[in-house]
Curated annotation (Swiss-Prot):
This is Small ribosomal subunit protein bS20. It comes from Salinispora tropica (strain ATCC BAA-916 / DSM 44818 / JCM 13857 / NBRC 105044 / CNB-440). GO terms for cellular component: cytosol; small ribosomal subunit. Residues 1-28 are annotated as: Disordered. Residues 7-23 have a biased composition (Basic residues). GO terms for molecular function: small ribosomal subunit rRNA binding; structural constituent of ribosome. Binds directly to 16S ribosomal RNA. Belongs to the bacterial ribosomal protein bS20 family. It comes from the Bacteria. It holds the Pfam family Ribosomal_S20p. Keywords: Ribonucleoprotein, Ribosomal protein, RNA-binding, rRNA-binding.
Amino acid sequence: MANIKSQIKRNRQNEKRRLRNKSVKSSLKTAIRKFHEAAETGDVEKATVLMRDAARKLDKAASKGVIHANQAANRKSAIAKRVASFSA
């Protein structure tokens, strides 16, 4: 346990941020998982809608600093490539 006032405050802030980041990451994983499930079943329209939702959540997570911008770009690219493979 910290004794210094500023460190006690820093611990409080870190805990708040950790919980917020955990929530964002969880919803991100859920969105991507739902996309993959739709892609597995071959439902192109549903997968396309879920791809947009997942891409939006990836962008938000990157802008909030929860994940790195390059990681968001790589994941968006992977799901976009999977949607493109439906039409090819």
